[in-house]
C-alpha cells in the first residue's frame, strides 16, 4: 500500500552503529484509531494534501526569492566563520571547531535525495522535523542546528533553514581550507513534516528492503531504516569491505552519484572531523521526538561522564581519519593506502579499523586534550575504497593527482547539495558558478523573438488542419509535460526532450504514434520559422504544448464552449548532447493513471500509482480527479485502449465520465478474461456497456473521490468541469516554467 510515505537516504559514512541504539517503543493502544487502521486497503489521498498552505506562517504572498536576493550573503558567511571557532560550553567543539559537525549536518540534509522519485534532499529543511530529526544516523545534529539558531534569528526570513543548513557546511569547508565551486540559495522552508516512504521496517536500524535478488526496493536509497546510506560497520554489521562496496555503489548510485563521485565524496568528506563513541549507546536517552518536553527538542541525552566533549556518543564509532581533522588535506587517502588495517572495536563496542603499525598510535591529535594522541581510524566502508577494484583504481588516481581529487570532490559536493533544486534558473545568489553541468538538465536560452497572439492563433489553425487528431495532440503534450516532478523539479515540457532518447522510446508514450505527431509538428515549426524575417521563432517544446491546448479548445467547442487555454511561449529545445540518457531513464512512467497506463512490474496498485503520480505533479485531489475525467473523454489513453472512456462522443470535452461512472444503471463486475479489468453491464438488459480499470472505478468506490466526482457530475457542473480541467491542464503544462505564473482559462458557453 501507498502509506503516505516516500524514501530518502545518504551516508557521510560517519554513520551509525546499530549496536548502540535501543528501539524506543511508542505505545499506540491508547490512541484513537484512524480510518487507515480500520480499513488498511483504503486508498490514502493524504499525499495530495501536503503540505498544507495554511501551515505557513509567512503567508501566501511571501516571496522567498526576493528576500534572499536582499540578503547580505557575505555577512552571513562571516558570521558562520566566527561561529565555527566559538565553542559553547553546552556542546563543546571538537578541536575547537564546529566545521566538521556542520559538514555532517549539511551532508545528511542533502544526502537523503534519491533518483527514482526525486524525493528527499535539503529543500524544505526537513531535517528539522520527524522522522529525520530523530533518525539514529542524525544523532546530535540537533546540537548543530541549535548552534545555528542565533544566525537564523539574526537574518530571519531572508535565509531559510533549508538554505542555512547547506550553506553552513559549505562555509565550514571553505573555512578549513577547501575551495568549493560555489553555493546557490533558493531552498524554501517547509513548515510541517511530510510522510515519506522510508521503508516498511518497524524498528530502527532494521533492513528488510531487498527484493528477491538482493537489490533495494524502489524507490528506496538507504540500505537500513534510520541511516542515510549504509551501515559503516559493513552490511548487517559484518565487517566485509567488498560487501560494503556493493552496498555503497547501489545506494550512492540511487543518490545520482557515479563511482568517481562516490569515491570523491567519501574521501573528501572524511578528510574532516571524527566519529564519536566514548561509551556504549546504553547511556543515551531518547531521540528528540521521544524526549521529555523539558529537553526542548534536544535528544540523545548522554549520561556517560559529562555527556559531551570527550564523553560524546553519536555513532558508537570513535576516532578521526586524518592528522588534520579541521584542515583540508589528502591525508585520508595517504593513510588508507599507506597502512595495513586491522579490525578492532571502539570504546562503544562498534567494529572499526586501526593501522597494524604501532608507530601510528600517536599520529592524530585528541579533540580536547592536547597532551593525548591517537591512531587514525578507518571504517569498514572506508576500506571498501581500498579493496573494491574499481573504487581502488579511482582512489589511487586521486592520491597520485591531488588537484584532480580536489576538483572531483568540489564538483561532487556541489552536486550533492544542489541535486534536488532542479534547473539553474532556480538558483539564487552571487556564489552560483557560471559553469553549466549536464546533471542540471540544461536547456538553451531564448535568443530569439517570441511569437505573439496573432502567431499563436495562426499556428493553432495549422496544427488543427494538419490531420493530427485530438487524442494524438493531447497525449503528446501530456507525455511531454507530465514528466515533471515537483520533488526535485526535474522533467517537464521545456526542452522538448520527448523527441530525444530515452523519452521518445518509452512505452507509455506510444513511440510510433509519437514519432508521427512530432514529425508533423516539426514540419509546422520549420515552415513557420523559415517564413519569418524578423528573427521570430517557435520552439518545438512550445508547439507541443500549443498543440495540446488547441486540441482541448476544439474539444470544448464540440461541447458548446468557446475557451482559450492560456499559453505563454518561452520554452526552448534541448539537444541530445544536453541530455544525460541514464539520468533521464528514472523519469520513465511505469504507471500513469491519467493515460490509463500501468506496467505490472510495479509494487503498488494502479490507484496508488495514480496518487503518487499526482503527488509528483503537485496536484490536489480535485485537480487529479478532473484531469482523469477529462483525459478519458478526450480518448487520451496509452495504446488507444478504451478503458474508462465513458462517453459516446470521444474527443468532446464534457463531464460524461463522471455522469456515467456514477450512474446506477450500470453494474460492475471483474472481467473473467483480463486481470485488473472491470466490465460494466446495463442492469436491465445485461448488455456490456463499458470496460474500466481500477483507476477509473476508484472515483466511484473511494468515498472521498466519489464526493469530488459527484461535484463534477451534477447538471450544473458542466461549466465548472471545463474550467477546472483547463486550469489543471495549464498547471501541468507550466509546472516547469519557473519564470511565469500559470493563468486561468477564459470560458464562454
UniProtKB/Swiss-Prot annotation:
Annotated catalytic residues: 108
GO MF annotations, alphabetized: catalase activity; heme binding; metal ion binding
Signal peptide as annotated in the record: 1-27
A Pfam family the protein falls into: peroxidase
GO terms under cellular component: cytosol
S-S bonds: none
Binding-site residues, heme b: 270
Catalytic activity: H2O2 + AH2 = A + 2 H2O; 2 H2O2 = O2 + 2 H2O
Cofactor(s) for this UniProt protein: heme b
Record note on cofactor: Binds 1 heme b (iron(II)-protoporphyrin IX) group per dimer.
Subunit structure: Homodimer or homotetramer.
Family: Belongs to the peroxidase family. Peroxidase/catalase subfamily.
UniProt name for this protein: Catalase-peroxidase 2
Organism this protein belongs to: Legionella pneumophila (strain Lens)
